[in-house]
Amino acid sequence: MKKFLRKPQFWLLTLGGFLSTSVILAACATPSNSALQTVFKARSSQFFNGEQGSLQSALTTALKNPVANKQFIAAPLLKALEAWYENNEDKKITQFLKDTKSNVDSQYTTAVDKVVSASRNKSLFVQQDLLDNAGGSEATWKAQKLLEQLISDFASRVFQKNYLNYKKDGQVSTGPFTYDELHKEESWKNFEFSAPRFSETNDDFFAKIQSQVFDQWVEYTDPTLISQVNYKYSAPSQGLGQIYNREKLKDKLTPSYAFPFFAEEKDIAPNQNVGNKRWKQLVKGEGAITDNNIGQSGTNSQKTGLLKYRNESNKGDFLDFPLNLSDTNETKQLVDASNIVDQLEAANLGAALNLKLQVFEQDNDELPQIKELKEDLNNTIVVDKSKDVEKASKTNALFYNDQEGKQQQSDSDPIAGALDDIFAQNTSEGTNLSKLAEQVKKAAATKMEAKTAVLRTNNSKGQQNNYVVLDAAIPTFNSTTSKSKNNSASNEVLVALKSGSINLRQVQQTDQNSYSPIKFRIVRNSTGVTVFGLDGGSYYLKQDSTNKKSVSKQSLTLLTKSSSGNSNKVLRDLDKQKQFLKFRAFQAKTNTFYSTNFAFSFPLNETLKSWFDKHRELILANALVNASLDQKDKASKALTEAFNPYKELIKEFAPVALATTMISFYFDQMKALNNKLLERARNLNQNVNQANPTPWLNGLSAKLPYVNTNGNYEKLNNYFTFLITKTLWPKVGQEETSISEESNKLKTKTADVDKIRDKILENIQTKVNDFVKNKLKPALAPRPAYSNVILLNVNNDKVLSSGANWSLASLLQSDKVNPLSFMLLKQAFDNNDLFKKAQKLFKDIQEKSSNNGGMQSSSTTNSDADALSKVIGNYYYTTWAKLTDKSIYGNPKDNKFDELFKLAFEASIDEKSFNVDYKAVIDHYRFIYTLQWLVDQKLKNFKSLLKTNLKFGEVAFIAYKNTETTNFSNPQGVFGSYFNYENSASEVKESTQTLDPNNFFYKTTTKPTVQAIQQVASLALVQKQQMQQNSTDHYGFTGLSTSTSSMFDASSRDAILQQITKTSLQQYGSKDQLKKIIQGTNNQLLLDRIAVQLSGLNPSTTNGGSGKTIATYFQVDAVGNPTLDFQAKRKLLLDLLDQYQNYFGNGAQKSQRDSTPSGTGNYLTYQNGSDKYTYTQFTYQDIDSLSLTTTSGTNNKIASDVVAALLLFQAADKGTQQLALSAINKPQLNIGDKRIESGLKLLK
């Protein structure tokens, strides 16, 4: 669309022009006049006039911000820390304080020196550039720098030692420690953070801080120990070429996730215990810690298989794997909710969260269940779904044959059958992997042409596709105990329990074929196969407050779900979780293991310090509120006395602030989780979607078995929702289960999670607003000389005032769009009458679009919103098109692109999220305002713009690019590939490389072609035929093109303009109109331009003209002078026009069709290589007939939805927006802080 009118920026974007004026300073002031011009003249004693600009509202906004809130606590913390350092008996610590203060003084001097200005202006620019954003004074600047250095040093001191100890009879024990004693649950109450028996100065204080940090870490992040064994891929003795196609794969063929293999036991050297050797021992349960081993009577000795490694005899729900059964030297990994996405690779991450959700009895993705673990790993990752597994489906197994799906048919798919190239021609191995190879070869030979990797459809020849590849699965146990047969090991012992009262001996009398899942996961990942479970995962669970009875250990540890009649909800028991983690951490600290074969690491101090460093101020504030410090210690007493005046305020605010920060963080982690799994898919798609696809290089790479809906792995994200609702929401409000739950389980749909978030944000707003209003009561503080910012006085307390001003400075950073500037601009829009109409118009558009599913077939449009709703997807698309990663919202369902684009659009303008894109929201406001301005009074302003910029006689056209393409569901693979590595609920059917996704998705509902017309048709008939074909969306719309602007390349644009010039004079209106122009002009250049165009046309020999030809116009005499003067030339043109009457009106349409055989109806075509353009000429005379309302029989040349599409393009034009906004009344913006003005400029 042509970029019409470049007017000056509208009033809201040039606030500096009338607000940044000088103020009259006191007589003693010395800065120059030019320097004084930088002093902001406040027009309000608030941040801006209006409720949201009040001092209270601004401070509330800062204190609920996850980044700015910690600054409020910083000032009281500094006072407490300074007292502790100053009164410490460790002279090194007191000296550090002195040195740091001296260092801060030097930093301040250096910072002042870096402020470049004349000496007389120094104080002015120091105030504005240095002090305004640090609380307003030299003292607050230095205090902020001092805190940064003190709290960093403090953290290094607190976590220098590990203070977790074991107490016997109230005394710290120095050992020796035994596993028999420590592993008993009754001993765990003796673990605590305390000073060692032979302590040093500050050890007791540091231990108490560590204890508080540990408690917060457990509560806010749900730490988890994953117990695991790993088995690495390895090549067979004769090389991978005996399974895979070495000739095709070449150097890519190495044991890996794409080309998995595990050497058979017979190929492993006798002196090595790796891979399949270890695996065989694992599935038999060898080397496990049993009750008999530790002198206990219990159930563990009665188990077999994997369950032997799960020890519950002491109620700890231990899961311990021997080191000698793993190919890696670690069998435990510590993760928590704050780092799990970063710590685990995608395959392990998905399985771990799936298992966590199973333990919490929340909805999770269904995984295949392995009935029996084979003794060969190759028969574990590839299984026969007809007998080896249950619940295998197309969403959780690669190469799944969907017997219920519709048969796909494709004779032209270039990649169909390509998986045949993965495997060698002859696979002699007898494993399931080789049987899968045979299956793929046979499928290719029988020409199964399903688009989704050969094996997705029914085989008309009866091909049985039983072998599937698993990426994650759940092992099961059988209800009976049987002997090991052939190459399999049984892991059956127990059945699903309805009640914890059933003892194990009774349980064994059950049906032979009953398989129940156990709480382990088997994962195929980048390095091999991992088997893991959660260590202690069910020990620290409890039922909710409606029933405090402990959850049955058997039902929680062994079974997937409680009985269907159980309405109790499972929550974490924080005390037990802390006890269990202390036990494991102390084991690692003291190397007190059952044996060295069960050793593991537990990096407690590193983990706690990492957690502390992320939220230092908030965590330390909570710690000081709750810690009972020794008042006999001089430093602790001084800290307490300094902190006490603020303790109650911080006790009320700090938990809310930390919870707010973590809630925001966990919502971000949902996005990070989505991105991690999608990034894995993107990497796999590269080999499929390139110009010359090589899908065989992906080998047996598969989609992970977690369903992606609209770009979200909703059920995996449910883990973070669980922590947010059950742990954090109660700190800022009260969970409303009517919003968060359904049938006693958390809702998982993204729309439902958004409602949970919205309610939490409401609670945070209420909580913080009440705190500010009732406890802080901010007032205006005196403004320092030359200052440009508002400073607050909180309770007449310098410390609290500094914290408040630091928090505001963090919120109002000059290089970022801030929420207060956004609120002011939003307020200005909301108070405008035309904007109110614009909001209603857009709401009507969305409602009509939703009611018709975005696919409107009716040709009648009764209102502006009717027509615009047909093409509103073009506006949504502009948001989606800007995304760097276009896969984050998933795939279109049934090619309904608008629904996908709308998701991206709505997310971008969401004003309720923790991370509002203020710029996107304001851009949307400008757009709908401008749209209303263009639409108002029957398109008055739109038509005026067109007439101003499209001159009479100028050639222009409306065009579509490749609109007739049928294979366009996934241009250039932007929606992934048909292998569906994303595991999207909406699968991509195909991929093509010929379309440009950058503008292809603009559309109209009117089809730009009609059936061929043999005779000159009336305009009404043409329009009627267009309407009859108005049945679906027609993509490739490129808007209005002129000689200076077009959405496609210049060569194609110029060729079409030239084609129009050679076939039409419609740009001049009618023949009579052109005659009037010729008769009335004295412009030689105009006459020459008309003559040149006539010379390119074929005149009619049957019309008038008395034998005259246009060639006469250009004749010259012997010396090169024109033989005709101006008057003669004008008369010649007038005489000749009758010969060209077929190039006007309907005659021009016939002429164009006749000269271009491919032209049909009102539209013509132009071919440029593989691109086909369908276009129709647009003239000055067409402007007045433009309308958004159309009824049957209307004779408008341009259909109403096409007009609507043009309007959307025009409303998005920045120049048009400036023109529209400059037309409204300019309200007086009364601002009291220059940072608000700076934020407005960033919203341009």
From Swiss-Prot:
Coiled coil: none annotated. Keywords: Cell membrane, Lipoprotein, Membrane, Palmitate, Signal. Residues 1-27 form the signal peptide. It is a lipid-anchor. It is found in: Cell membrane. A lipid is attached at residue 28 (S-diacylglycerol cysteine). GO terms for cellular component: plasma membrane. A lipid is attached at residue 28 (N-palmitoyl cysteine). Belongs to the MG307/MG309/MG338 family. This is Uncharacterized lipoprotein MG307 homolog. It comes from Mycoplasma pneumoniae (strain ATCC 29342 / M129 / Subtype 1).
